[in-house]
């Protein structure tokens, strides 16, 4: 799991998702997109599934720290095969920009996984249910793919 979080909202969302993944028996390797030493994390191409979490910058853009992580991963030849994307955003800036980074990342990685978009900080039963349902859907989609390595259980 790679997370870019400005205010902590996306980080908290990632922690909640990681908890659901661990509860389902998956190993979760956590990395901040702007980590000074990314060598401690599992290489992106070694993970069965990479979960990318991002906040959205001005006008629906992907923040620079996530772009830098993607560029560094590509330079090392570690483009992940399977990517699911989640993020937080604010509708006050307009629906056309709301969680724009999520959509951009999905397009960039040609992800077939459903997106998860949460308004600001995840809270309450409605968000908890949406997060649990999304995580279950992502894991079900992962298990349905023909090229997944079901023995390693790395997310």
Task: Put a short name on every predicted segment.
Residues 1-22:
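N-terminal beta1-alpha1 ligand-phosphate binding loop
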Residues 3-6, 33, 88-90:
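Cofactor-binding loop segments of dinucleotide-utilizing enzymes, especially the Rossmann-like FAD-
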Residues 32-39:
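Short acidic loop-to-helix transition motifs that present clustered carboxylates
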Residues 8, 37, 92:
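Flexible, glycine-rich phosphate/dinucleotide-binding loops
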Residues 12, 20, 24, 29, ...:
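FMN-binding flavodoxin-like domain, especially the glycine-rich phosphate-binding loop
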Residues 40-44:
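Short glycine-biased active-site loop of nucleotidyltransferases that positions the nucleotide triphosphate
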């Amino acid at each position: 799991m790679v997370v870019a979080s400005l205010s902590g909202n996306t980080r908290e969302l990632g922690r909640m998702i990681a908890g659901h993944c661990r509860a389902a028996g998956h190993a979760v390797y956590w990395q901040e997109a702007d980590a000074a030493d990314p060598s401690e994390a599992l290489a992106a191409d070694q993970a069965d599934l990479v979960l990318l979490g991002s906040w959205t910058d001005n006008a629906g853009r992907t923040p620079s720290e996530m772009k830098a992580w993607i560029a560094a991963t590509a330079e090392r030849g570690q483009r992940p095969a399977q990517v699911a994307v989640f993020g937080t955003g604010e509708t006050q800036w307009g629906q056309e920009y709301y969680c724009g980074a999520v959509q951009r990342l999905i397009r960039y990685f040609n992800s077939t996984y459903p997106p998860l978009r949460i308004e600001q900080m995840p809270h309450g039963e409605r968000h908890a249910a949406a997060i649990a349902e999304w995580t279950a859907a992502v894991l079900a989609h992962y298990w349905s793919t023909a090229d997944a390595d079901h023995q390693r259980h790395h997310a």
